[in-house]
């Protein structure tokens, strides 16, 4: 009974903290070669966000030459809107939405415009944060995403060279710090038993835990979030 009361008290504190500072975050991305996916997953990891992959109904070819010099170039010239594979994500659940993609022909791929203009999605009132991966430069890609969401608030975007997208944790952290996203609570976190230590951790009895390293299985409140170690 005492444990139940203490857990309820801790969760009440969590809810109060989230009501004041908590925002739900979604990372959305389109990736062809995997570089943008790696960057998106790093953003998700550091923000504790949900993640959603944007995919075309008809998958793009794996052949770079065909994709670069025929398909993507033609889509841009025709201002095409490739059909989306699905529209399953519910944007109403989120306050901050990251939108990421590779740079194709100096701009965002047309599939990104399909996503941002989809009638099933409403970005009005959301905070949209663009990011991209590129071979030479980001060009107008970040602005493409901003211009396609005129009724949203926007924060500084991030462009990273594709070859560095797999080793970008420090660049992502510095960027998230600059735009004040790092401290936003995204929801309940499930962690594995090898979770690293955190600044504020309490067990179900309300006792401060010095370190989460090698912590036994159970329910904890870590940095204001309910955390389950399995």
Task: Label each PLM-derived region with a short phrase.
Residues 67-152:
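Helix-loop-strand module that forms the ligand-binding subsite of alpha/beta enzymes
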Residues 20-96, 108, 177:
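N-terminal beta1-alpha1-beta2 submodule of the flavodoxin-like/Rossmannoid cofactor-binding fold
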Residues 4-14:
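Sec-dependent N-terminal signal peptides
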Residues 1-4, 230:
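Positively charged n-region of N-terminal signal peptides that target proteins for export
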Residues 219-230:
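C-terminal tail/sorting-segment detector
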Residues 183-205:
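Residue-level detector of functionally pivotal "anchor" positions at catalytic/ligand-binding pockets or at interdomain
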Residues 15-19:
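Sec/Tat signal peptide C-region and signal peptidase I cleavage site
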Residues 157-185:
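Glycine-rich phosphate/pyrophosphate-binding loop and the adjoining helix
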């Amino acid at each position: 009974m005492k444990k139940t009361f203490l857990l309820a008290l801790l969760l009440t504190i969590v809810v109060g903290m989230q009501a004041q500072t908590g925002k739900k975050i979604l990372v959305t991305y389109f990736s062809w070669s995997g570089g943008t996916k790696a960057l998106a997953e790093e953003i998700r990891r550091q923000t504790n966000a949900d993640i959603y992959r944007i995919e075309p109904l008809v998958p793009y070819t794996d052949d770079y030459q065909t994709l670069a010099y025929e398909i993507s170039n033609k889509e841009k010239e025709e201002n095409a809107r490739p059909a989306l594979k699905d529209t399953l994500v519910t944007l109403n659940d989120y306050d901050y939405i990251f939108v990421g993609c590779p740079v194709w022909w100096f701009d965002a791929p047309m599939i990104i415009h399909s996503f941002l203009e989809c009638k099933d999605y409403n970005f009005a009132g959301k905070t949209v944060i663009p990011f991209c991966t590129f071979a030479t430069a980001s060009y107008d890609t970040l602005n493409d995403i901003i211009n396609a969401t005129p009724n949203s608030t926007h924060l500084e975007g991030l462009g990273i060279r594709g070859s560095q997208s797999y080793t970008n944790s420090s660049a992502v952290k510095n960027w998230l710090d600059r735009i004040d996203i790092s401290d936003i609570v995204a929801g309940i976190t499930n962690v594995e038993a090898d979770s690293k230590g955190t600044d504020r951790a309490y067990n179900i009895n309300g006792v401060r835990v010095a370190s989460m390293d090698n912590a036994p299985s159970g329910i904890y409140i870590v940095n204001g979030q309910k955390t389950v170690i399995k």
